[in-house]
């Protein structure tokens, strides 16, 4: 129930052998390299070692990665693959390329060879496609500008500067046109003509295209003034004919460009199909080599050696030592020691049984344990599954969840580790829900009663009815009677069970916290933070047990009262130590906090009722519609059932997941768990497209 024990690995390696060592460690993936740059700032270490930097070959590798990435981006842009529902629901594992390289130079040579071959085939079409795209973009912009001038029939070749006059085109906001004409006439001393076309909308503004003609000697004044009126100038050059003729010519050019583009794209698609897998493998190999080269920057070095430090799980320590020594052909000194750093700096690796391991993701969602802290995953699993089943509590919903979980686990989980874990968790949660659904007689709520007149909860097939009386629990046959309290229906029984389970759940957390404090030598904290609450819960069980045995209520209440007072005094003492009298007074309120934690487990009943109640409402509504509307009512009723139960399943399934986690994260973990550990991050070659 604790993270894997770690060892500190320290090694001095001959510089000629460092590449072999790094490659071996990277492939094996059992150590986490330590960055020594901060340590080497220390004066004592500075005299022994100097900081290392990334390997020289990293620059070359990075350049090749950029080139490969650019081609992959181009392949991706031209061959946008359509993903079918079948591909999403049943993804195929990636076919990996087998590779065998013994040095970075071999990888670089291979990458250069492949990239050169691809470039010979791809560069020409890709460059031409880029040219066409640029030309198309310019033509589309030109087309837009000329289209605004369509009502002004003049030869566009005259736009620009002539021997004596300048002709310009553009657009201005409609409301400024009148003022513009007046002001330009002033600054041009009347030597200007302005012609306007049909208005159009652009950027939510009504604009008007204009063409103006002025003497060249007046142009500077005109341009200076026209800018004040939000004038948007049209850059139309090397175009002949009227706007209509020019637009027709542009359309022809665009069609020709599109035809050539399509031909080039088809050619590049074929090249993508031919080279993409190979290129993805190349990119991955280069990424791996870059990671290896960058790792050098974490080392220390002398003239002829490298010094490395790493974290390694204790179970793999000897394996890592042998790996380094063998890779260095014996030219290495390796030392394995116990950690001497604060626990916050020691990486955490969780190690649970296979059936529990997927649930580690739920622990990580909260926080990883510190190195010397308890791993709560094993404690979380039974509570999470039990609470989930109680909250969703419908056998049909549970069966559906199990099927969905199995599908995610076995299908999508083949290509996604996260989906694999989630699918496994949902499968077990679904099984738990089926069991709880059978216990409570929940089969799409009261579907069997509403449509077939068969009330499962009134038969021996169901132990308890969340919405009322059942065969086993009713007015004539109460679950139990304690003083004036008589449990004669399902909701009351489930509430009592929820509080009981909550007390047990908290008790387990308190025992773990007590044990941890004792182990650390914090006896005072163990008693104040956990011990008094353990005694209080036990006193509640003893008091209730005595009442069941027929003891006087005053005696049972007195026993519980004694430990309530003890808990208040302990909380006040704790508050006084931390902040004086005021904190002591506030500390007395911890008892109400404890009560709040216990009552929080009543949410088990709340979600149980929500699931069953909403399912019942859907069934009643569907039945009423089906019976009151001839023929079509049956179809509508089926739609109501499908939509209503789907909504209920999704919403309460999600709610059960969230609230089950909340009971652990807030109520349970707060009794013993702090978290805040640093995840073990192995120096490992991540291979998706290749296998060594």
Curated annotation (Swiss-Prot):
One of its GO terms (molecular function) is proton-transporting ATPase activity, rotational mechanism. InterPro entries: V-ATPase_116kDa_su. Belongs to the V-ATPase 116 kDa subunit family. The keyword GTP-binding does not apply. The A-type ATPase is composed of subunits A(3), B(3), C, D, E(1 or 2), F, H(2), I and K(x). Optimum pH is 6.0 for ATP hydrolysis. This is A-type ATP synthase subunit I. One of its GO terms (cellular component) is vacuolar proton-transporting V-type ATPase complex.
């Amino acid at each position: 129930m604790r993270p894997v024990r770690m060892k500190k690995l320290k090694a001095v390696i001959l510089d000629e052998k460092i590449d072999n060592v790094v490659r071996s460690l990277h492939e094996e993936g059992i150590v986490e390299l330590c960055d020594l740059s901060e340590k080497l700032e220390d004066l004592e270490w500075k005299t022994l070692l100097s900081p290392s930097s990334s390997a020289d070959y990293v620059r070359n590798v990075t350049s090749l990665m950029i080139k490969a990435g650019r081609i992959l981006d181009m392949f991706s842009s031209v061959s946008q693959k359509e993903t079918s529902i079948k591909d999403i629901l049943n993804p195929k594992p990636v076919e990996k390329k087998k590779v065998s390289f013994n040095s970075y130079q071999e990888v670089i040579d291979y990458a250069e060879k492949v990239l050169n071959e691809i470039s010979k085939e791809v560069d020409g079409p890709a460059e031409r496609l880029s040219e066409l795209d640029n030309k198309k973009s310019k033509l589309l912009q030109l087309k837009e500008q000329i289209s605004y001038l369509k009502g002004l029939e003049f030869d566009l070749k005259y736009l620009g500067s002539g021997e004596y006059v300048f002709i310009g085109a553009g657009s201005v906001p409609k409301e400024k046109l009148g003022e513009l004409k007046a002001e330009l006439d002033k600054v041009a001393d009347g030597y200007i003509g302005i012609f306007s076309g049909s208005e159009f909308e652009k950027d939510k503004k009504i604009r008007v295209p204009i063409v103006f003609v002025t003497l060249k000697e007046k142009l500077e004044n005109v341009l200076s003034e026209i800018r004040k009126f939000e004038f948007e100038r049209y850059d139309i050059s090397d175009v002949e004919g009227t706007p209509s003729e020019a637009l027709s010519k542009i359309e022809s050019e665009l069609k020709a460009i599109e035809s050539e583009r399509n031909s080039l794209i088809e050619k590049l698609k074929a090249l993508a199909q031919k080279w993409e897998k190979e290129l993805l493998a190349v990119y991955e190999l280069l990424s791996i080599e870059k990671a290896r080269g960058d790792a050098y920057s974490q080392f220390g070095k002398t003239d002829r050696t490298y010094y490395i430090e790493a974290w390694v799980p204790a179970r793999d320590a000897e394996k890592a030592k042998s790996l380094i020594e063998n890779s260095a052909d014996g030219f290495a000194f390796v030392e394995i020691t116990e950690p001497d750093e604060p626990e916050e700096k020691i990486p955490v690796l969780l190690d649970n049984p296979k059936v529990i391991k997927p649930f580690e993701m739920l622990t990580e969602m909260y926080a990883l344990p510190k190195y010397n802290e308890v791993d709560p995953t094993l404690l979380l699993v039974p509570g999470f599954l039990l609470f989930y089943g109680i909250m969703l509590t419908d056998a049909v919903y549970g069966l559906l969840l199990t099927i969905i979980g199995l599908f995610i686990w076995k299908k999508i989980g083949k290509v996604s580790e996260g989906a694999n874990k989630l699918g496994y968790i949902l499968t077990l949660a679904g099984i738990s829900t089926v069991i709880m659904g059978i216990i409570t007689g929940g089969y799409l709520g009261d579907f069997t009663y509403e449509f077939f007149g068969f009330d499962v909860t009134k038969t021996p097939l169901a132990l308890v009815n969340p919405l009322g009386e059942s065969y086993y629990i009713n007015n004539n046959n109460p679950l139990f009677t304690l003083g004036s309290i008589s449990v004669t229906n399902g909701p009351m029984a489930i509430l009592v069970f929820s509080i009981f389970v909550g007390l047990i759940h908290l008790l387990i957390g308190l025992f773990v916290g007590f044990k941890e404090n004792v182990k650390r030598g914090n006896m005072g904290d163990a008693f104040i933070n956990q011990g008094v609450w353990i005694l209080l819960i036990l006193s509640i069980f003893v008091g209730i047990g005595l009442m069941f045995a027929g003891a006087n209520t005053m005696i049972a209440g007195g026993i519980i009262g004694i430990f309530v007072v003890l808990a208040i005094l302990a909380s006040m003492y704790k508050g006084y130590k931390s902040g004086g009298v005021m904190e002591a007074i506030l500390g007395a309120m911890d008892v109400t906090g404890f009560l709040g934690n216990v009552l929080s487990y009543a949410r088990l009943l709340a979600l149980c009722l929500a699931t069953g109640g909403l399912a019942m409402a859907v069934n009643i509504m569907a039945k009423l519609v089906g019976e009151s509307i001839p023929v079509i009512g049956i179809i509508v009723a089926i739609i109501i059932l499908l939509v209503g139960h789907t909504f209920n399943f999704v919403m309460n399934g999600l709610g059960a997941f969230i609230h089950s986690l909340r009971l652990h994260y807030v109520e349970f973990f707060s009794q013993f768990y702090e978290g805040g550990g640093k995840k073990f991050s192995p120096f490992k070659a991540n291979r998706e497209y290749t296998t060594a």
